[in-house]
Amino acid sequence: SRGLGDVYKRQIVGIERRGVILAKRLQAEIERIEGIHIDCESLNVAVYRDDRDARPKEGEPCTIDTTEKTIILVDDVLYTGRTIRAALNALMTAGRPRSIQLAVLVDRGHRELPIRADYVGKNIPTSHLESVRVAVADLDGEEGVTIQE
């Protein structure tokens, strides 16, 4: 229950795709353990990315009401920080949150931006030549984290 505070002003936001599944799991665990419900939303950051100019940007602008809410932003893997930067831009265009906390399943290091997770499932140092894949049963038919070259 660390930092839950006023649950009516809390919101969990998962970054599409695997972050959404992890966010829903987090929501269910908070409800099971604390007996409280916190809304959970899905966020597509494609239109806010700065590192994919070669491809057309797909998706809709963020419409999540973030005003005066404490947002728990959830993603599967934290790497360069660019996806999180895009998510922060999206959330800020939709309102002015009271605060934003970041929860990730895996932090693999190699930041290009000054971004740090508040909640980390596992730190897994990797090389730039490796990639980390998070598998979730809802999308992949299995659960697990693998490192690939």
Give the location of each predicted region.
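Residue-level signature of catalytic and energy-coupling elements of molecular machines
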Residues: I12, N44, I100
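PRPP-dependent phosphoribosyltransferase catalytic core
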Residues: N89-E149
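Short glycine-rich phosphate-binding loop at a beta-alpha junction
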Residues: K9-E16
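Short, glycine/charge-rich flexible loops or terminal/linker lids adjacent to PRPP-binding catalytic cores
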Residues: R32-I71, R82-R85
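Internal catalytic or translocation cores that form aromatic/hydrophobic pockets or channels
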Residues: K69-S99
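Residues at the starts of beta-strands that form the adenosine-phosphate
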Residues: K9, D39, T70, S99-L102
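Short, small-residue-biased leader/transition segments that mark boundaries at the very start
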Residues: S1-Y8
